[in-house]
Structures are given as structure tokens and as C-alpha cells.
């Protein structure tokens, strides 16, 4: 089960299960629960097209329009398995675009929802619900909010129009393994994707058949990407490294060794001189390591933020004030809560210890290890083969003797 924290103007967006929560400055919360059975949801039946017909706007002629997980065309489903459906249809990917007040949410039932936040900042309006070919692994808006890119667990990336939001998606590019993160440069000329097979790929847009370069060097899955400046990219990997790249040339500029494999990172809004805080959530997420970014390709360790026994971090993010927010789960009960760590912006030190600013008492989010399966699996078939060969030779020798 996934959870997400995003900055949205003066609010903090927290999403998990099937609910999106907006936390205001005064810690008041308004929530929106995604319900596929709501009649007001504009449901689009056309699924995205792939390579051979990517220029087509719709594929409704070839699709039956069955809603995922129901086998029906009317959007209805069996309500007798609500608890199971809540888990199956939970939020699996999310992104926000402040310029156009948009929120994109992908759910486990292979749906992509596009929401608009009303001017009062307290209401979500459903613009569309579109079908995905596979379960999503990540979603990202372009800087201007004209479109969003959705990547799935099969390695394919699709482009979804946010202006003509009734259109199905169009296939852009594909990897040979699961895509874990995606970025779009501010000019919308390059798409950067990272995958489970240790690769970072820089692809031209909209001519995605042209690959600009690869950023190669990681030896495990690349879980997170962040822009640090023009042509400067930061990557986090399961090989226990942070790496800085010139993403137009594919050249590695610097690296930072970590004690544990990297899972997620959060980047504080950088100052004009490029300084700021970087928080890294590693595998076995009982602590967050905080670093100070110095210059364009360096960082120094500040401190580790540790939780009590029996608690784990699910995700992290910095708010508008530069404070670190951590979504914390009690392993024994699945009770989620939001913790805030306040930092001094001048010396980058922790100013206040963790304060749990919001508890979601009516919700449960069991902690699930979503990282261990990403590591490479090594199989030593030679020893098994040699053992079988030895036994076969011994049996043959006995028969001949």
C-alpha cells in the first residue's frame, strides 16, 4: 500500500488508500474519497493505443469498454468485497500541478483520475477517469500542466492530455523492465525515465523514437530522480548511492555513498546559491538521513531522524516552509500519522523535534515492503548442473562396472 505527500500552494496534500487529504496551515483537514461507482465520474472507455496505432485518438472500436475488475460496461461492481476492493483499488501514483490546479491520481484498478482543485482550495472536481493498460508505477505532470505522463509496471510510458482530458492516452516509449520514476524538463523537450534494471534514459519529446543519451553507472534499481538545475540531475538507487549527472551528455559528475539502499528522497526548495536540504529514506525505513546540498554536485551529512521502535516511514516531503513531513505507520496496528520536523534555514540544523501534527484515526494502512522485490535475483545454476552431472556419471560408472 502506497502513501504520498505533495506540496500544493499553502496546503499539504496527503493521499493513501482511496482518500486524498488536504491539510491546511491551521491543521484543519478536508478529504475526498475516490469512488469509482459515483455517477458523476466521467468514465472514458477507450484504452491507450500502442506502437502500431499511436496516432489514433480513440480505440473504442476495438475495446468493449469493460471497467477494470468488474467485467461490466456500466461501471457497477460487486459490493460484497468492499474491503478487498479498497486495497485493490487504492491510490498507487499521484502528482499535482499548481499552475493549473490539477491533481492526477492512478489507482490499482488501472484507472487514471484527473481532478481540478476549485478556487476555494477545498473542493476536488472530477474532470475525467481514463483506463490504463496496466497498473501504474508513477505519474508526472509537465511543467505547464498541458499533459501528464503515466508509466506502468510493464515498462511502458503513456501521454495523457490534460486540456482535452476525454482522450485516451498515447504510447510514448518503453523499457524492458518496470519504470520507477519519470521527469519532464521545463521546455518539454526531454523525458527522463529510470527503471528497475539500473538504467536512466533520456528521451527526446515529442519524437520519442530518438534517445538523447543514457546515464549509466548504477548497479541496482534507480528509485528516484530530481532536477537540481539546468542539465543537472540527481538520482537515488538501491546500490547505496546518490549520483549527480549532466543529463544531456550522460556524464556522471559526482556520487555520495549511503549506508543502506535508497528508496525515496525529498528535496527542499533550493536557495539562489543552490543550498538546501536533501532527505533520503532508505530501505528498512526506520530513519531518514538528512544532507545539506552544497554547490551543484556535493552534499554533507547533517543528521539522522529516527523513529521509535515499531514505527516506519512510508514517505517524506518538504513543505513550503522548509520543514520535513514524514508519513509514519505503526507496524502493529497500521495506524498512520503525519510528523513534522522543523529545520533552521540558516544553519540547516533541526530546530524542533518531531511533532505529530495529524493522526488519521479512522484509517489503517498496513506497512508493506515494496522495495525488496526490486533487487536483482541471482541464481547459481552451475553448481546444480555440476551436481547432477556428477551423479549421472557415478550411475553410469556403476552400470558399466
UniProtKB/Swiss-Prot annotation:
Which residue stretches belong to region Disordered?
45-85
Offer one example of a GO biological process linked to this entry: tRNA (guanine-N7)-methylation
The record's annotation in InterPro entries points to: Trm82 (IPR028884), WD40/YVTN_repeat-like_dom_sf (IPR015943), WD40_repeat_dom_sf (IPR036322), WD40_rpt (IPR001680)
Could you list this entry's UniProt keywords, alphabetically sorted.
Answer: Nucleus, Repeat, tRNA processing, WD repeat
Biased composition (Acidic residues) is annotated at 54-64
Q: Name one GO cellular component term.
A: cytosol
This molecule's function is given as: Required for the formation of N(7)-methylguanine at position 46 (m7G46) in tRNA. In the complex, it is required to stabilize and induce conformational changes of the catalytic subunit.
Query: Subunit info?
Result: Forms a heterodimer with the catalytic subunit.
Q: Which family does it belong to?
A: Belongs to the WD repeat TRM82 family.
Protein name (record): tRNA (guanine-N(7)-)-methyltransferase non-catalytic subunit wuho
Q: Which organism is it from?
A: Culex quinquefasciatus (Southern house mosquito)
Amino acid at each position: 500500500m502506497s502513501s504520498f505527500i505533495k506540496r500544493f500552494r499553502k496546503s499539504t496534500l496527503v493521499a493513501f488508500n482511496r482518500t486524498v487529504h488536504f491539510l491546511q496551515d491551521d491543521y484543519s483537514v478536508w478529504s475526498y474519497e475516490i469512488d469509482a461507482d459515483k455517477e458523476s465520474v466521467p468514465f472514458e472507455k477507450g484504452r491507450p493505443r500502442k506502437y502500431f496505432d499511436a496516432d489514433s485518438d480513440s480505440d473504442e472500436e476495438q475495446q468493449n469498454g469493460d471497467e477494470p475488475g468488474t467485467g461490466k460496461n456500466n461501471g457497477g461492481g460487486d459490493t460484497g468485497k468492499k474491503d478487498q476492493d479498497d486495497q485493490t483499488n487504492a491510490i498507487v501514483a499521484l502528482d499535482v500541478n499548481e499552475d493549473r490546479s490539477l491533481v492526477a491520481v492512478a489507482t490499482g484498478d488501472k484507472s487514471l483520475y484527473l481532478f481540478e482543485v476549485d478556487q476555494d482550495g477545498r473542493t476536488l472536481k472530477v474532470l475525467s477517469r481514463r483506463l490504463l493498460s496496466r497498473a501504474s508505477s508513477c505519474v508526472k505532470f509537465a511543467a505547464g500542466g498541458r499533459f501528464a505522463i503515466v508509466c506502468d509496471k510493464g515498462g511502458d510510458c503513456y501521454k495523457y492530455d490534460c486540456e482535452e482530458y476525454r482522450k485516451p492516452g498515447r504510447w510514448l516509449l518503453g523499457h524492458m523492465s518496470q519504470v520507477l520514476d519519470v521527469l519532464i524538463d521545463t521546455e518539454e523537450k526531454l523525458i527522463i525515465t529510470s527503471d528497475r534494471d539500473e538504467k536512466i534514459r533520456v528521451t527526446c519529446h515529442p519524437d520519442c523514437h530518438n534517445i538523447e543519451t543514457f546515464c549509466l553507472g548504477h548497479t541496482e534499481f534507480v528509485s528516484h530522480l530530481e532536477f537540481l538545475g539546468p542539465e543537472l540531475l540527481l538520482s537515488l538507487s538501491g546500490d547505496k548511492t546518490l549520483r549527480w549527472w549532466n543529463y544531456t551528455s550522460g556524464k556522471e559528475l559526482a556520487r555520495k555513498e549511503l549506508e543502506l539502499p535508497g528508496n525515496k528522497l525529498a528535496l527542499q526548495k533550493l536557495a539562489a546559491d543552490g543550498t538546501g536540504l536533501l532527505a533520503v529514506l532508505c530501505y528498512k525505513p526506520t530513519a531518514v538521513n538528512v544532507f545539506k546540498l552544497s554547490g551543484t554536485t556535493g552534499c554533507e551529512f547533517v543528521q539522522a531522524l529516527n523513529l521509535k521502535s515499531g514505527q516506519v516511514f512510508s514517505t517524506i516531503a518538504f513543505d513550503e516552509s522548509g520543514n520535513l513531513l514524514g508519513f509514519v505507520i505503526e507496524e502493529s496496528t497500521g495506524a498512520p500519522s503525519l510528523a513534522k520536523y522543523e529545520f533552521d534555514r540558516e544553519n540547516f540544523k533541526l530546530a524542533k523535534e518531531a511533532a505529530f501534527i495529524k493522526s488519521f484515526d479512522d484509517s489503517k494502512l498496513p506497512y508493506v515492503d515494496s522495495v525488496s522485490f526490486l533487487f536483482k535475483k541471482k541464481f547459481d545454476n552451475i553448481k546444480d548442473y555440476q551436481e547432477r552431472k556428477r551423479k549421472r556419471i557415478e550411475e553410469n560408472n556403476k552400470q558399466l562396472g
